[in-house]
C-alpha cells in the first residue's frame, strides 16, 4: 500500500482558477485538472527559470519528486491545449509557504516542515491484534 504523499510547499496561489478556449462556454467543455503544486512546479521552473534542485528545495520535495510533478503538469497542460479543453487549477497536497497547511488545517511556522501523513484509522483487525 502506498503511503500518503507529503505536503508540497507552495508560495503562490493563482488568482484565476480556470482557463478555457475563447468563444466556447465552460459548460460545453471538458476540463483537465491541474493541482496547485503542479502549477507551482511550472511557475518555479518555466516562469522563474530556476534550476530543478532549487525548485525542489523551495517546494520541500526531493529532486526526483519535483521532476515527476513537473512532467505530470506539463503533460496535462499540453493535453488540454492540444485538445481544446479547459484547465482548472484546484486540489492537491500542498501547504502555503510559512502559512497554512490545507491538509492539517492549521498554521505552520517559518521553517517548520509539513509532515502530514494522513489520519490513522483503526480497523477491527487492529483492535483484535492487541
From Swiss-Prot:
Pfam families: DUF134. Disulfide bonds: none annotated. InterPro entries: UPF0251. HAMAP family: UPF0251. Belongs to the UPF0251 family. This is UPF0251 protein Swol_2090. It comes from Syntrophomonas wolfei subsp. wolfei (strain DSM 2245B / Goettingen).
Amino acid at each position: 500500500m502506498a503511503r500518503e504523499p507529503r505536503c508540497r510547499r507552495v508560495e503562490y496561489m493563482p488568482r484565476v482558477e480556470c482557463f478555457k478556449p475563447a468563444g466556447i462556454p465552460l459548460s460545453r467543455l471538458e476540463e483537465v485538472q491541474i493541482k496547485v503544486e503542479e502549477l507551482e512546479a511550472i511557475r518555479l521552473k518555466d516562469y522563474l527559470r530556476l534550476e530543478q534542485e532549487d525548485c525542489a528545495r523551495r517546494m520541500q520535495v526531493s529532486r526526483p519528486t519535483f521532476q515527476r510533478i513537473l512532467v505530470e503538469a506539463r503533460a496535462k497542460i499540453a493535453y488540454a491545449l492540444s485538445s481544446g479543453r479547459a484547465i482548472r487549477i484546484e486540489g492537491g497536497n500542498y501547504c502555503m509557504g510559512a502559512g497554512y497547511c490545507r491538509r492539517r488545517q492549521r498554521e505552520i511556522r517559518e521553517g517548520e516542515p509539513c509532515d502530514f501523513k494522513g489520519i490513522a484509522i483503526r480497523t477491527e483487525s487492529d483492535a483484535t491484534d492487541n
